[in-house]
Amino acid sequence: ISKSIELINEMGFEVFTFKKLGLAINSPESSVYRYFENKHTLLIYLTSWYWKWTECRIVFATTNVESAEERLRKSINILTKPVLVDNAISYVNEVLLSEIIFSESLKTYHTKNVDKENKKGCFKAYKSVVQRVSDIILEISPNFELPHMLTSTVIEGAHEQKYFADHLPSLTDVTHGKDAITEFYTELVFNFLKK
């Protein structure tokens, strides 16, 4: 897992192969196929792992916080701020994994098989994060009709803005060293909920 994260981050998902992973871990390519049918299923696994880990971070940050507004702020921070190293999990470099999520995660569900994979539960972890944050939104504004849309827009928009800042800077107003993404999405959400 750790080497696949390193290689996908280094070379990109399109160039990454199980043959290259096998060479990197000094194991036959066929040994990787015992665990994953193809590199797409590996990406789904990594994406699901990331979202379960993110949900744990949200739960930890929001437990015992009475104010729904503060829980929402903390959740938006986790969903939009850069990931820091978590030494509690030695076999996963969360910083590199988050880079993969920003640049490659759309490839997990922008496929022809998305409906079939959804029925198998492949996106359950991501949907759980969206539901958790949507529930907080509904605590603040019980009549708000679009909590899932707002939450998924924050997540995907933040990922796009991070990607644009690194690769297509003329498409964003993000400058390195400033937390514009978190500020933007926090303001967007709370202004939207005031309506």
Stretches found by the model and what they are:
Residues 127, 131-142, 152-195:
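C-terminal peripheral helix-coil segments that are non-catalytic and often amphipathic
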Residues 1-2, 36-59:
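An amphipathic alpha-helix adjacent to DNA-recognition modules
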Residues 70, 97-139:
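Amphipathic alpha-helical packing segments from all-alpha helical-bundle domains
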Residues 45, 61-95:
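Hydrophobic alpha-helical connector segments
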Residues 14-41:
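Helix-turn-helix
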Residues 53, 57, 86, 104, ...:
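A short secondary-structure junction motif
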Residues 20, 71-74, 78, 149-156:
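Amphipathic alpha-helical interaction segments
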